[in-house]
Amino acid sequence: MNKNLSSSILFLFDNISNIDTVSQLNNKYNIFKSINTGAASNYESFINDIDLLKTAALKRSYLEDIKDNSTDFFNKHIDALLNSFIIKILPLEKDFFMLSSHSALLESGGNFKYDIKNDVLYTVYNNKTYYMVQAVLYDKYNPTHLLYLVQDLKRSLGSSVIISGGALFNADGHKQGINESIYMTILSILLSALILLTAFRKKSILYLMTTIIFSLTLGLAGCIFIFGTIHILSIIVSASLIGLVVDFSLHWLANNQNKVIKSSSIRLIVKYLIVNFIITAVGYMLFMFSFMLLLQQIAVISIITLFASLLYTIFFLPYILDGAYYTTSNIFNKIFHKYLKSIDFLMSYRLFVLLITAVIIIAGSIKLIATSTFSDNIKNYSSINKDFLKDTIIAGDITGMKNPSNYLVIDNYTIDKEHKLIIFLLKNNLINNYKGLSQVFLSVHEQAVLKDIFSKSKDNSSIINMYIETGLDKNFIEEEFNKALSFKIMDINEILNINTAAPFRYFYQNNHGVVFFESNKSYNDLMDNNTFKNILFLYDAEYYNLVEMINMYFSQIKSHAVILKLIGIFVGFFILSIVFSLKKSLKISFAVLLSLLFAISIFSILSIDINIFAVFGFILAGAVGIDYAVLMLNENINELDRYFGIFTSALTSIVSFVILTTSATYAVFTFGLSVALSLLIFLYILPLFAFYNKKAGITPPN
């Protein structure tokens, strides 16, 4: 069902002469596998199907008129026979009683009617006639070509054409994602290169860019190899890895400042680099337990990329930079020294700083508990093209097909069951309108009622005499009644096996029927309404709301993520306790947790949505925070170099994640902001615990 809806594009033209423009443009862009300007792709096939379905697809309102007064129906039929101006869908020898002229299929299940003369579906809205063209995209089409086709149509016809379809939003998101991934990657590389040049002064430091190229290439290739595809948001988020990729290199280079680099010096910190990788990889590996393919792809890209970076840093980079000599620029020194002085200041007032931190955490927690429902809203995750949205709303008004998110699923489905269910819901003002199979097709019972009316009318002499009085032969009339009685009563499976009815199959699958509906009542109002629940129970139906289901799904992932985060902290603590003492491990784990709570509280106080992407951002940040703690506790490196390594690597990582906050996609924005903010807090909170026994921070050398 979703595939059918997402691959279909609707075009509405206010001039019938323009309906062929879609086919003409498709010759240029080749994105549509079928384009229907009429009721069917094959007119003769459509007419034959109308014949087969002339009773099963008879409009219910017309059936009710026949039931209410069959004599009046036959009187009107005689008038129609004598009126040469009335258009007959089928020849009289096939459909003497002209039931096909009242087929619900001629209205396409919405506001549209069928113009048999021009073989086109049309509707009138605000005193203007609109002609419909439906196009179905190839399974593998070029989204950019779809946007080009739409641009060409709008450029030539302007508001004379309305275009609607879910694929438009996907194509626009794809284009936006590609543009963002390109500029974010370029900007991240340029800023990282600028930081490295400022910190190490010599151009040879740009060899670190080879680490980025090598690692990211393997990461993206690995994702495509494992999943067979890659989400555009995965590519965007992978741009943020640029800062993390050079972390291993910067940790090593921090111990080689102001001296000639020897390739053998890497051995001093290999153990710590491996620990760093394991902890960060565990942070990303937790994403694999998410149900979201996007997060799983991010995990795979990140783990492979960081592993490649680790190997490159250990086995290649030391030999590339062997013999190099790096000193820090004056500009970077000034910035770095100001950072060290700020650490001195914070350590001098450590208890006061921790008190302020605790107050902010308490305030943020109170607001979070008071205002948050812990539920996610899918509407906050993406940006929507306003022009496409405007056309979609207009198209919904014109067609009467707004694709509401409310729907019912009926077990052991029959059309009769659906029809009775809808009648009860409408009578109780629980729904306003609906879309389902009972809108278009009659139930087995209703078809039998129609057959019974013809059977009784055949034996009704007054009705037969009405036809004889017009000059028709009695035997001919009786033969036509016998033809009408010979039609087959069709169940839902037989109906949907006919080509013209096949598109309605997405309303019925595996003995389950789907009914879409609109209601003035909210999701919660319907869920709390006993009458609504009793009616659904009576007819084996269940209520779903697509948006609420997605929100609930995301909320479940978020709660799952919180559990994963706690597991991650425990795993990080376990790894730390192997390398360091239990006391140090507890101290650092607490510092990381405190920093994350501080960052979350800032989100809460500033009313920034803590959605699932923010939660996973905090999970990742926690792993990176433990990495920094490992470097701080590495006594093989003097304290000043430890600070330098952490500050430089944090700076490149923060820049990479800050760039994500420029994304038009809210999910990417919150992910980038949550990590960047957490890393910034780590720079100031972690030293308070890593060097807890110092009375003050490190004094910069003169």
Where are these regions (language model features)?
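Juxtamembrane extramembrane loops of integral membrane proteins
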Residues: M1-I50, I384-N385, D391-K427
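Extracytoplasmic
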Residues: S41-L197, K202, S438-F573
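Juxtamembrane segments of multi-pass membrane proteins
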Residues: L351-F352, T357-E469
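Active-site lining segments that contact anionic ligands and/or coordinate catalytic metals
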Residues: N403-S405, I431, A501, Q509-V514, ...
